[in-house]
Amino acid sequence: MIYTEFSFPNDSHIIWSLMIVTYPYISGIMAGAFGISALYFVFGIESLKPVSRFSLLVSFSFLLCATLPLLNHLGHPERALNVVIVPNHRSAIGGFGYIYSLFLVILAMIIWFAYREDMIRAAEAASGLKKRILTILLLWNQNLNDDTRQVDRQMVFILTAIGIPSMAVLSGYVGFLFGSLKSNPWWSTPLMPFVFFVSGIISGLALVLLLYLYLGWYGYLEKSYICLRMLCSLLWFSTAMYIVLEGVELLYFYYESSDAWFVISTLLFTKLKYSFFVLQLGIGLGVAFVLLSAMFTLKLEETSFAKMGAVAAVYLLFEVWMMRWNIVVGGQLFSKSYVGFREFHPQWLEKEGILMAIVFTLLPFLVLFAVTRFLSVRPTTEEASEHITSSGSQAGENI
């Protein structure tokens, strides 16, 4: 079949670029990290105790930076709060401000109750500016006894249970926005929110796994082979679920065979051939899933198991970023004429270029470093003793 490409004259630019790719990537990591802490605080999975509180700090750091790419994308970022002050309830983006603010408050309260005992002890041992800051964070209340500890644990449980649906909505909200745009067939699929949510969980699990191995190596977190296996198990399960969702989504497009299938198939096998099939599905998803499967199939030593898990986590972080790219940018590569394509080549020093995307991706790590100056990632003496006891009783069964 011979056809001629044609694009409308006013339809030649990519509007949503790297900033809109970076935002769902950061928010996905936030969701995955929070999910790890929820599995311990709400569902009582004891093997995740060494990373339960640290995951809260990771989630909080990425949540604080999640909106920065969006603000950089706006022409007038000073007007961003208008979506909250003067909301339009018929606008899909109008509810984002409320959902984000709600989850930010919930997460901050969870961290406050989870770290209250640590902050009290740190305030007693500190002096100068750090002591003043900790005293303010504690709201000038440093009472600590068995009753207050019980209240703290109960509040962490209640708030985390409330935060789970809030986190799910916030993480899947981007997928909901894309899926609701019926004018774009590459985005308009009912599976889009679930694809964004599950891939976000994968990225959060992968990053926490890498940070846990790094901090455990230098003694900042308690080493636990049981915790490592649980994180890798969750990563394998989430990856398997994501593979199913991606496969079902592609089958949905193929068997629906709508008028837009011609442009979607052309997009996949031309413009996105390398980034989708090779980088995302092949190198990112395929290699990582094979590594994770081999980890639980082969009888590996703890060191080899940890190394393979770290490599798989790196591949999955890359895969999730490529997935964001292929959806956000890939969905804008074809013209509204459905027979023409656009070109997009991001530059390094643009306002929304490669350098700014790298800066916004690395910024949460600086925030995490600053947060850990006041909230220690090391387990308390009570937690460490409990963890050693439980690990000793379960090690033979799990290993």
Task: Locate predicted features.
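Transmembrane-helix bundle segments that line or gate the permeation/cavity pathway
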Residues: 26-44, 54-86, 92-142, 159-163, ...
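Juxtamembrane/interface segments at transmembrane-helix termini
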Residues: 6, 41-48, 74-77, 113-124, ...
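Membrane-helix interface motif
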Residues: 2-3, 71-81, 172-183, 248-260, ...
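TerminUS-proximal long segments
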Residues: 307-399
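Long, contiguous internal "core" modules enriched in hydrophobic/ aromatic residues
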Residues: 24-26, 109-306, 312, 319, ...
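N-terminal signal-anchor module of multipass membrane proteins
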Residues: 1-42, 369, 386, 394-399
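Membrane-interface transmembrane-helix boundary segments in multi-pass integral membrane proteins
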Residues: 19-23, 94-97, 192-196, 258-285, ...
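Loop-to-helix transition at the N-terminal end of transmembrane alpha-helices
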Residues: 14-25, 48-60
